[in-house]
Amino acid sequence: MIQQARRVAAGLLCALLFLFCPTTLAGCGKVSAPASASAVLSAVCADPDVTGRDVPDTCAIYTRTADTESADYLSDTLFSALFGEAARGLLSGSDPAPAAINDAAVCISVSPTPFEIAVLRLSDVRGTATAAGICRTRLDAVQNAWRGTEQEAVANAGAVTVEGSYVLLVIAPNPERVLRAARAAIRAGGS
């Protein structure tokens, strides 16, 4: 009687494993690739909670994925002009060191208002301190440029944050709202 109960229990266990194991394993295979920096920036700019409130209508967007001949291409020269001398070589790397930042996208207001979003995606989280440092330098420069103006509070509200292998720089009227949209886009991945 006990042996028969054990056989029935083992049979039920095998049936349950047979039914649920493929479903569980299929779910494991749905790990999406990391979102590109331009995909994160596009998602932020398209987010209805951000658009119209925090993103001005007149923005210039520069991405690493744009055609190298395009005016929208985020070149090493433009990147180091924006983020300072410490940023030189971080996008392109140098022999034999690979690029520390393997993808980047920047949105800058072309109207006279302090607004900027930078999304930097790194190949290794160990480089986030360096990337956050250049973003902090950029934020300090923007804050100094707007000191004593009516937009000083917006510049001073800017934030630099690290989200896994991403570093985000946000200068906006409500940086937390922009960061929430960026975090959601990062979590969604490249799907």
Residue positions per predicted region:
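Bacterial N-terminal signal peptides that target proteins for export
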Residues: I2-L13
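Short, compositionally biased low-complexity segments enriched in polar/charged residues
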Residues: C59-P114, R126-G127, A155
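Short Gly/Thr-rich strand-loop-strand
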Residues: V125-E163
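Post-signal peptide N-terminal segment of mature Sec-exported envelope proteins
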Residues: A35-G52
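Extracytoplasmic/secreted envelope proteins and their assembly/folding machinery
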Residues: S38-L41, I117-V119, T128, A132-R136, ...
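A short, solvent-exposed beta-edge/loop patch
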Residues: S109-S111, R121, Q151-S191
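Bacterial N-terminal signal peptides
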Residues: G11-T24
